Amino acid sequence: ISLESGKHVLIEKPLASSVDEGEYLVSLAREKGLQLMCDHTFCYTGAVRKMKEIIVSGELGQLYYFDSVRINLGLFQHDINVIWDLAPHDLSILDFLIETKPIQVSAKGACHAGNGLENIAYVTIEYADNFIAHLHLNWLSPLKVRKTIIGSSEKMLVWNDLEPAEKIKIYDKGIMVKDEEMEERGRLLVSYRSGDIYVPHIDQTEALSVMITEFASCIKEDRQALTDGEAGLRVLQILKATEQSIKNDGANVPIQ
């Protein structure tokens, strides 16, 4: 209604309850020349912005995987499953950090509350260049965990969002594969590298403040938002493919 009335919109995630609805909103905003921005709040935190900065700098090298654990006890909901509740956080972060488009997704889930809605799910998303993302989502955990590991060719990044001070740690650890000797001997030779660990400085500005500033700037400067409607639509497309995969017993589902 707001877009139809000619108003710019900052909308809570997910963008819509279906891909069709999301496509309509994005199309309407484009048609009317309005800002449609998604509340992907994590993308405006100092930690995630620092992760983006480190990735863009090339310090980590080639990215190999994104492994996220987002678990806690509850809150069980009557209208959505754990995927629609928790996955939008990680999917929006992935969309912000990873420039390549995801190819396909496979997922398995289980319901233990008798209402037919999954309260635990394991989601695997495949990208080009052999990059893979894995999400562990759970409403039935005795512990609250918010941890992500990004594995790469040069260094490794660990983000613990529950850590009050040192949320991000960079590990100078990895492997080296000796290709020439492997070809000669017909077997894999791997050496391991273990160096220093350092904690980068993170901007402590409140994420909601950064997001609102971005929204206002986009309106004034007539530019696309960092987490615009298109970003929200991409998250919806993965959510849809994830649900299809669960219904098909974990089959790979292409992401449209």
Q: Model features per residue range: what roles?
A:
Residues 46-68:
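Rossmann-like NAD(P)H-binding beta-loop-alpha module
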Residues 41, 154-226, 251-255:
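C-terminal glycine/acidic-rich active-site capping loop/insertion
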Residues 73-143, 149, 163, 230:
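Rossmann-like dinucleotide-binding domain that binds NAD(P)(H)
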Residues 37-40, 66-69, 107, 135:
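Short glycine/serine/threonine-enriched helix-capping/active-site loop
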Residues 34, 244-256:
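C-terminal capping/lid region of NAD(P)-dependent oxidoreductase domains
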Residues 23-25, 51, 241:
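Aromatic/hydrophobic pocket-lining residues that form π-stacking "cages" and hydrophobic walls in ligand
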Residues 1-43:
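Beta-strand-loop-alpha-helix segment that lines the small-molecule cofactor/substrate pocket
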